């Protein structure tokens, strides 16, 4: 069964669960058979992308969203790299990863995404005025030259040093660790843009869908073995997702066995 590559937030683990349920012979909800059903469009959040011919959407039309929120700024938050960060302007957000952008879209702030990674697959990222390479070698000068108002990094490994240097030159920078549970990421991204209460509401819904996905996974007759191969990890070379990757967490939650974990791969390709 083919799965749309752009199922985001908690809709992705639910999709994985349903897909593995199909592979494992368990019955899945009838809604999972809908093909290319578009998601409802809300302000700041794009509708689902039409799927290529022959693809099937097993889940993802119910991505939680809270549009029309009013950010409370300025705000001070604890960045995951240990620093206190003050945020006063979110009009031009430089986003370090699609997970951050997905939360911004869900909060109705997709139009505030000013710069995104070159390999972004989110609509807000692709529509951003700038696409930029974010990795361990990204220089502070290049980020400053974008003239953004807030840098939202998504990796302690890639963005801790960069965020520190940005703060040294007076730029606002927050890092959200990409390896933590999705509800925690939602809360922290929302807090960083002055929407802490909305983030709590959204995170609660994300957790509900995660629990739903886990329940589907528990019903599998056997645990399918799944491998996630990334074309953008390890310096752009094909990489298998290891035990510390988000993919491994989703596969396990959905009742499958991550082959990368089984093979002793520990690092994430991202």
Each predicted region: which residue ranges?
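Soluble non-cytosolic domains of exported or imported proteins
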Residues: 71, 94-95, 137-138, 153, ...
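Short hydrophobic/aromatic-enriched beta-strand-loop microsegments
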Residues: 111-117, 153, 170-176, 258-260
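Short, structured coil segments at secondary-structure junctions
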Residues: 109, 128, 168-170, 254
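Bacterial Sec-exported substrate-binding components of ABC uptake systems
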Residues: 2-14, 21-99, 198-227
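Alpha-helical, coiled-coil/dimerization segments enriched in small aliphatic residues
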Residues: 119-122, 238-269
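Extracytoplasmic/secreted envelope proteins and their assembly/folding machinery
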Residues: 74, 87-91, 97-104, 110-111, ...
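Extracytoplasmic substrate-binding proteins
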Residues: 83, 160-236, 260-262
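A short, structured surface patch at a secondary-structure boundary
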Residues: 55-58, 64-74, 91-146, 150-155
């Amino acid at each position: 069964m083919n799965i749309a590559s752009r199922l985001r937030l908690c809709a992705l683990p639910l999709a994985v669960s349903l897909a593995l349920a199909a592979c494992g012979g368990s019955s899945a909800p009838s809604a999972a058979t809908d093909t290319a059903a578009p998601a409802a469009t809300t302000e700041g959040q794009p509708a689902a992308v039409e799927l290529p011919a022959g693809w099937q959407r097993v889940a993802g039309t119910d991505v939680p969203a809270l549009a029309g929120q009013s950010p409370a700024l300025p705000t001070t938050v604890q960045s995951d790299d240990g620093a206190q960060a003050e945020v006063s302007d979110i009009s031009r957000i430089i986003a370090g990863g699609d997970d951050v952008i997905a939360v911004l879209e869900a909060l109705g702030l997709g139009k505030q995404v000013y710069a995104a990674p070159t390999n972004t697959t989110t609509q807000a990222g692709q529509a951003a005025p700038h696409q930029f390479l974010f990795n361990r070698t990204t220089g502070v000068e290049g980020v400053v030259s974008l003239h953004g108002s807030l840098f939202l990094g998504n990796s302690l490994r890639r963005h801790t040093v960069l965020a520190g240097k940005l703060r040294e030159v007076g730029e606002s920078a927050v890092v959200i660790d990409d390896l933590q549970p999705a509800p925690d990421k939602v809360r922290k991204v929302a807090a960083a843009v002055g929407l802490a209460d909305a983030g709590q509401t959204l995170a609660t819904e994300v957790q509900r869908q995660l629990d739903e996905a886990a329940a589907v996974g528990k019903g599998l007759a056997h645990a399918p073995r799944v491998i996630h191969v990334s074309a953008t990890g390890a310096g752009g070379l094909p990489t298998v997702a290891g035990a510390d990757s988000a993919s491994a967490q989703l596969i396990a939650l959905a009742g499958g066995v991550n082959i990368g974990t089984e093979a002793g791969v520990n690092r994430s390709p991202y």
